[in-house]
Amino acid sequence: MARYIGPKAKLSRREGTDLFLKSARRSIADKSKFDTKPGQHGRTSGQRTSDFGLQLREKQKVKRMYGVLEKQFRRYFEAADKKKGNTGANLLSLLESRLDNVVYRMGFGSTRSEARQLVSHKAITVNGQSVNIPSYMVKVGDVVAVREKSKKQARIVEALQLAGQVGFPAWVEVSADKAEGTFKKSPDRDEFGADINESLIVELYSR
C-alpha cells in the first residue's frame, strides 16, 4: 500500500477531527469543516456506525495522524502488547518516540509530514550522528538537532518560531537558538491531548 499523497485536509475531514497534517497556521474557517465529510454538503445524521466500524475508523485516524502504514502499525501494536502496562498507552508512546514525530514535537517541522522530509533528507542528527530513518526510535536522553547547514532553511526557522508561540511538550527540552532538543522522557498518556480513543484500536486487534 502506497503512502497517501492527496489533499491532507481531506483526511482530517474524513476522520472528523484535526489530524495535525497541516500547519497550525490553518484558519478557524478551515478547521470548522472537519465535521463535514469529503463530498458531503452540510451536516447529515447518517447511519449508525457499527462497533467494528468505529474501531477501524479509529485505527485509520491514528495511522494517518502519525503517517504509518498498516504493516508497521501492526508491529507497533504487537510491541506495545508485550510491554508492561496499558497496551493502548504503550502504543501511543511508541508512536510518539518515532524520530519524525520527535522532530515535529520539537518544532523543527510544522507538520509530521514536513518533519519526515527533514529526516529523510538528512537534515537531522541524533547524538551528533546523521539519521535519515523516520521510524528510528528515539530514546530517553537522546539529543535531536538540525544539522548546521540546514538551520537557516526558511521552513525550519518559521516552524521554530511558530512552535515557540504555541509551546513545547513537557517531555522535550528545546533550545530554539541552537535548533536542538533533548528527549527527556516518554510521554504519559495524559500529557498529550490528541483526540484518540486507543482502547478502540486494542479492541480491534484483540478480535
UniProtKB/Swiss-Prot annotation:
GO molecular function: rRNA binding; structural constituent of ribosome
Domain S4 RNA-binding intervals: 97-157
Keywords: Ribonucleoprotein, Ribosomal protein, RNA-binding, rRNA-binding
GO terms for cellular component: small ribosomal subunit
PROSITE patterns listed in its UniProt record: RIBOSOMAL_S4, S4
Region of interest: Disordered: 30-53
Family stated for the protein in its record: Belongs to the universal ribosomal protein uS4 family.
Biased composition (Polar residues): 42-52
Protein name listed in UniProt: Small ribosomal subunit protein uS4
Organism: Delftia acidovorans (strain DSM 14801 / SPH-1)
Pfam family of the protein (one): Ribosomal_S4
Signal peptide per UniProt: none
Subunit-level organization: Part of the 30S ribosomal subunit. Contacts protein S5. The interaction surface between S4 and S5 is involved in control of translational fidelity.
